[in-house]
């Protein structure tokens, strides 16, 4: 079993670019199509580690879905981000849904 460093609903930062994001799903290892030679995912060691589906915002404040290796992320210590309140709201909403799932008939 592979342990992931970050959890669903957790806020993270891209280590190199500094973008704030929210983890929305986790793959225990790289699970997309075969990567191109110039992509980070060609590294076998990185492919075997967890990969994260992360929602971030572009420069216009629009949500962008990214797929990032664990090595590309760092944990975010702050809980409030006045410059990106939609990321705070998304993280809160996901955590709330995980704590109190709705029953369906």
Swiss-Prot record:
GO terms for cellular component: cytoplasm. Residues 75-105 are annotated as: Disordered. GO terms for molecular function: DNA binding. Its main location: cytoplasm. InterPro entries: Hemimethylated_DNA-bd_dom, Hemimethylated_DNA-bd_sf, HspQ. The keyword Cytoplasm applies. Pfam families: YccV-like. Involved in the degradation of certain denaturated proteins, including DnaA, during heat shock stress. This is Heat shock protein HspQ. It comes from Cronobacter sakazakii (strain ATCC BAA-894). The lineage of its organism: Bacteria, Pseudomonadati, Pseudomonadota, Gammaproteobacteria, Enterobacterales. The gene is hspQ.
